[in-house]
Amino acid sequence: SKELKKIKNPKNILGGKGANLSEMGRMGLPVPPGFTISTDVCDLFYKNKKKLNSKIVNQIKIELKVMEKSVNKKFGDLKNPLLLSVRSGARISMPGMMDTILNLGLNDKTVVALSKRTSNGRFAKDSYRRFIQMYGNVVMGVENHHFEELIENYKLTKGVLLDTELDENDWDGLIDDFKKVIKDKTHKDFPQDIFEQLLSAISAVFLSWESNRAKIYRKLNQIPSEWGTAVN
């Protein structure tokens, strides 16, 4: 954040969200630890056939270690796992146009750790199914209605109306159903490798910059496509 003063237009490099978070951190406000992948990386991503190059991947690993130390949690740890949110950060807000992924870092093993850590199995399983649904939709391209239909059918079978009436075992069953629908629609398994999850989520946010809805929004609001987005 000390380096922020040296950047002439931080929003151009870090995006609106990243620049504001960095500024708040510099002021000593209580901001959750994190890091921003700059708009320059977005440009490199598209020039590199829509892939993150090895230098960027290594830098992400370094920043992740710094974050782990600051929160005393480890990404993928089986006792106290670090969970991440991956969000877009254009220099001008584009509400609802770009993709976000929450609870990243959950898999079949870390969800058990989260359950033990929070003493709340229902919360842990619900968080995991939300992540699988978000990841399946945003990263793997499975339309959201497939997941919603599974939930509605499950509630009908159980004879309940609200998601809050589903318990830990119910969400456990739906987690399996969600994985099956991902496999059925994509012919790929939902990834258990959490670093693969992270890199794919970052790539998905960069790709959402060129989604149809984002292009239309930019056209209507005269936002240049070459600006790109940061990732927070």
Show which residues each predicted segment covers.
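Nucleotide/phosphate-binding sheet-loop regions of phosphoryl- and nucleotidyl-transfer enzymes
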Residues: S1-N232
